[in-house]
């Protein structure tokens, strides 16, 4: 299916977050609130107070560290441990797909380009790659991006990293969008990072600012932003997390990540007034203090945190 035809079919299902014509290219008249270099304020607010109230309780209960940042569409920022390093795990896949979209905008890649899956691509948890390999069928870059975000397919993510130009090129992209992090490994090794380390980890504040910049800033064309939103909304492995208690008539697009001692998510949530909030939530335990209760309940911890903060969005 051609990219434009796909977008036309999905456009009406998406939240409206842009100003100007949605399909007229990269440099449209977006409001100042939506620029990637917007001024983030740290004014005290009810949401900030709520984070400071509830997150230490969860941390103490499970001997965990929780990093969370929420940025409203007007730039107001609320955060807990926002400048501490947390494992990114598979949340980074949303940024990998975003880099692909940027290269498409620059006409350096084509989403319709077909790739042959090799046996060496079939690393741990690569269901989509395995399907195409078993059927001896080529897969498009668009399908690889979809698999990477909606099913967190590891092999797809690694193939896309290769198309980008490897970790060096991807880290340059992360630097340019202000993510303030370094990815040192691809899948599955990137999941072995720990809280406080400085590779394969991110700080919630710059990570969330970068997410906002990709979705409503002027880094990507409006077509690419719509495509990214579509993939995030169609995430198929996140129902038990922030989606679980999402209020009726709200919308969410997200990308999850899981490690042996961590759970994390990045998301954009639109409330009933279609106002977007950009969120990063990282939950981890020190690798010398693992708890079986934490391992079994980290999904529900994340869901409950969402339930507690939704009244403030």
UniProtKB/Swiss-Prot annotation:
Q: Which residues form the active site?
A: 90
Where a lipid (N-palmitoyl cysteine) is covalently attached, the residues are 26
Any idea of its EC number? 3.5.2.6
Q: Which UniProt keywords apply?
A: Antibiotic resistance, Cell membrane, Hydrolase, Lipoprotein, Membrane, Palmitate, Signal
Q: Identify the PROSITE patterns for this entry.
A: PROKAR_LIPOPROTEIN
Under the heading SUPFAM superfamilies, the entry gives:
beta-lactamase/transpeptidase-like (SSF56601)
Instruction: Kindly list the GO molecular function terms attached to this UniProt entry.
Output: beta-lactamase activity
Q: Where is the lipid attached (S-diacylglycerol cysteine)?
A: 26
Q: Name one GO biological process term.
A: response to antibiotic
Name the reaction it catalyses: a beta-lactam + H2O = a substituted beta-amino acid
Which Gene3D superfamilies does this one have?
DD-peptidase/beta-lactamase superfamily (3.40.710.10)
On the tree of life, the source organism's domain of life is: Bacteria
Where the protein is mainly located, per its record? membrane
Q: Which GO terms describe its cellular component?
A: plasma membrane
Q: What top-tier enzyme class does this entry carry?
A: hydrolase
Q: Where in the cell is it found?
A: Cell membrane
Check the UniProt entry and state the signal peptide residues, or none.
Answer: 1-25
User: InterPro entries this protein is in?
Assistant: Beta-lactam/transpept-like, Beta-lactam_cat, Beta-lactam_class-A
Q: How does it sit in the membrane?
A: Lipid-anchor
Q: Which residues participate in substrate binding?
A: 255-257
Query: What single Pfam family name could you report for this chain, choosing any that match?
Result: Beta-lactamase2
Further remark: The class A beta-lactamase family has a specific amino-acid numbering system, sometimes called Ambler or ABL numbering and often misspelt as Amber. A multiple sequence alignment was used to derive a consensus sequence and then the consensus was numbered taking into account insertions and deletions. This allows use of identical numbers, e.g. for active site residues, despite differences in protein length. UniProt always uses natural numbering of residues, hence there appear to be differences in numbering between this entry and some papers.
NCBIfam families the UniProt entry points to: bla_class_A
As for family, the record states: Belongs to the class-A beta-lactamase family.
What name does UniProt use for this protein?
Beta-lactamase BRO-1
Originating organism? Moraxella catarrhalis
Taxonomic classification:
Bacteria, Pseudomonadati, Pseudomonadota, Gammaproteobacteria, Moraxellales
């Amino acid at each position: 299916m051609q990219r434009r035809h796909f977008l036309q079919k999905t456009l009406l299902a998406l939240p409206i977050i842009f100003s100007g014509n949605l399909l007229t290219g990269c440099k449209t008249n977006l409001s100042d609130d939506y620029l990637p270099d917007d001024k983030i304020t740290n004014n005290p607010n009810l949401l900030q107070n709520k984070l400071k109230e509830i997150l230490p309780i969860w941390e103490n209960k499970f001997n965990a560290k929780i990093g969370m940042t929420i940025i409203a569409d007007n730039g107001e920022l609320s955060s807990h441990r926002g400048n501490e390093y947390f494992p990114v795990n598979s949340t980074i896949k949303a940024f990998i797909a975003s880099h692909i979209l940027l290269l498409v905008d620059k006409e350096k890649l084509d989403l319709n380009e077909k790739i042959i899956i090799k046996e060496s691509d079939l690393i741990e948890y690569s269901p989509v790659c395995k399907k195409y390999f078993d059927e001896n069928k080529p897969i498009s870059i668009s399908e690889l991006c979809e698999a990477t975000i909606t099913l967190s397919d590891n092999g797809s993510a690694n193939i896309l990293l290769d198309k980008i130009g490897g970790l060096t090129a991807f880290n340059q992209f992360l630097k340019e969008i202000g993510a303030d992090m370094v990815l040192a490994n691809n899948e599955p090794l990137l999941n072995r990072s720990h809280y406080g380390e400085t590779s394969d980890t991110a700080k919630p504040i710059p990570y969330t600012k970068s997410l906002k910049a990709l979705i409503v800033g002027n880094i990507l064309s409006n077509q690419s932003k719509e495509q990214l939103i579509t993939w995030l909304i169609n995430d198929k492995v996140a129902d038990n997390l922030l989606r679980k208690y999402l209020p009726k008539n709200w919308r969410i697009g997200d990308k999850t990540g899981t490690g042996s001692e961590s759970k994390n998510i990045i998301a954009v949530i639109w409330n009933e007034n279609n106002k977007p909030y950009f969120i990063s939530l990282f939950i981890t335990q020190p690798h010398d203090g693992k708890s079986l209760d934490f391992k079994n309940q980290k999904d529900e911890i994340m869901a409950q945190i969402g339930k507690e903060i939704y009244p403030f969005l």
